[in-house]
Amino acid sequence: MQETLTFPADSAVVIIEGVEEPIDTVGAEQTSEIIGKYFALCDSDADWHDVHLPINLSLQAPDGMSISGRATMVRNEEIYISMRVMGFEAAVIYANNDSAYFVDKYHKYYFAESFKALMGSSCLTIGNLQDLLLGRAFAPGQGTVCEESAITLFAEDDNAWGIEGDPESPQGMEWWCIATMDDVPVVSSVSFARSETSQADFIYSDVQTTPAGPVAGIVDIALIDGFKGASAQLKWSIKDAKWNTDKQINFKQPNGYKIITTDQLLRFLGQS
């Protein structure tokens, strides 16, 4: 990673290519510590090719629903989540960098949308979404935060620090993440905001060590868009995960199924 680190002696901010103003001020000792935590976070991540693991998805608001299944991810390429009821595959969620699908095998209908539209026309990639779901630090539209060319590091409090993207970058949103001050820092939250009334927060807990580095076993998600809100929780069975087995995903658009609209999908999920 090619970067330029510049910071005043009394600032807790590290400026990496492009961010000019510090956003917090503390002593030089904490500044140095935060720099060290940033590089420790970078070092803790590891490359991975694929993972297959159990998942439990709970929709908590505005209505409640819980279902379990298994997820398969191929790094930077695909996500496949098979939701099962009494051992039978009842629904499928699939996404790649081009498209996203929700397939209801019981009622025989499906929803399809471009991945970019589903992400709100932001620059998020399928790899970014994988990191969001696993609790790994990343830079929207790029790879890890260690590959981002314009970020700011800042002091959150005595026990946490953060990474903020360049507000002038063409990403269509603000983003930031908070990490711990542990010897091996872990990401505790990632947030996105388009405005004061439009924000998404991902809160991570039960972080465990894996071949990909630290991964969150529990992901709490809160979405706010104007006067509407939604919340959900993902639980991964990290201990049962199988990493780097060259797992293949063979998803095909359903034949003979009825296609449904976004409004119909939201009604199905109890969000309208």
Regions found by a protein language model. Name each.
Residues 43-51, 62-65, 72-74, 93-95, ...:
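Edge/loop elements at the starts and ends of beta-strands within beta-rich repeat scaffolds
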Residues 5, 145-260:
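Gly/Pro-enriched, hydrophobic low-complexity segments
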Residues 78-131:
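An acidic-aromatic
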Residues 37-41, 56-58, 64-70, 80, ...:
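Low-complexity, intrinsically disordered segments exposed to solvent
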Residues 115-156, 257, 266-272:
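C-terminal low-complexity, charged extensions that often adopt amphipathic alpha-helices
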Residues 1-65, 123, 253, 258-272:
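N-terminal leader/targeting segments and the immediate start of mature chains
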Residues 65-68, 88-95, 171, 196-201:
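Amphipathic hydrophobic-ligand
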Residues 56-60, 86-88, 102-103, 107, ...:
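Hydrophobic lipid-interacting interfaces of membrane-associated proteins
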